[in-house]
Every structure is written in C-alpha cells, then in structure tokens.
Amino acid sequence: IFARTLDVFTANMSESIEKTIDISRILKSKMGAKAKFVPSFLVSWLKKTVHEDEVNRFLWESRHLQGTEWLTECVKYLKMNIQLEGVENLPDKNDGKLYTFVSNHPLGGQDGVALGSIIGTHYDGKFRYLVNDLLLNLPGLKPVSIGINKTGRQSRDFPRMVEAGFQSDNHMLMFPAGLNSRKQPDGSIRDLPWKKTFIS
C-alpha cells in the first residue's frame, strides 16, 4: 500500500511541476549560446514577473482546451467582467465574407484574450491572431495564431505570413501597434504608432 501511494504521489508531483512555460528554455531558444550570459537574478526576476508557476498551473489544468474555448477559460481564470456594447454591429457570421478586426492594445494580454474570446465565439472559432511568436509557447493559443518573429530573420517574412493568413478561410484579428499601450509624457495611456500595413 505504501509503495502504491508513493507511486501515485510521485506521478502527481511530476504532473504538477511539468512546465509548458520555461523562461530559461525560452531565453536559450531565442538567444542561443548568449543565453548563458543572462544573470541568474534577472532570469529569476523574469520568472516572477510572468508568474511562471501560476501560468504553468493554469496551462496544465486547461490543457484539454484550445482556441476559443481556451480563451474563454482564460477570461474566467483572470476573473474578467466583460460588458459588451454594439455586438449587433458585428457582421453576420453567415454572410459568406471574411473580416479583419483591428484593435488598439491598452492592456496587452487581457484585451487580446477578451477580444479573441468574443470574436471566436461569434464566428464559431474561425479567426486567427497575428501575434508575437513567443505566444506560440501557449498550447491553447497556438491553433488560432500566426506567429511573427519581430527581431529575427522571420521579420522579413512578415508580408508573406500576413498574406497567407488573409488567404485562409478565417477572420483576422490584429493589433497594429505591436505592443501594448504606453504611458505618455502627458500622463495619458495610448498605443505606440501603428505599424504600416496595407490596412493601417
């Protein structure tokens, strides 16, 4: 009985510490050999800042969900209270057309998750984000994302990747500022200048 209990405890412990988001691994994948020069205190700070343990716990508990269902679960987990106005202005999902939804980015992850949940629910999951490729580390988000590497060689492929997204049978959701809004010298919080694309 003791051995069986120990086996179950060990299995549960292994499950509980399984990491989907591993800051050290992500740094190494993005920086290669240079990652070893990042001070350990900075790595620890990054882990605390992104709430690595809490995020991994949520990802583990929601691992059976993807796309719109996962985004809606994120809304619940973050205890967001969303009040919708103007839903009647969203185009009919059965009109046979594809739409591009362009938004400012005041909060970053929170508004991205909320909009994805709303658009995904309205259009039966048929949408795609254009996102920073780091977000592809989130398994539930990956199926509805087109990852853009903003710093590496892939950034030159941005037009091609955007074109591929727009040629699909999905609606598109994008944040042209590329980053969440920033506090301005006058105290207001506004988007950075939107990056030029053929729709912004």
Please provide the spans of the model-predicted regions.
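Membrane-anchoring hydrophobic helices of lipid-metabolizing enzymes
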Residues: 9-99, 110-114, 124, 142
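Soluble catalytic domains of membrane acyltransferases
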Residues: 81-200
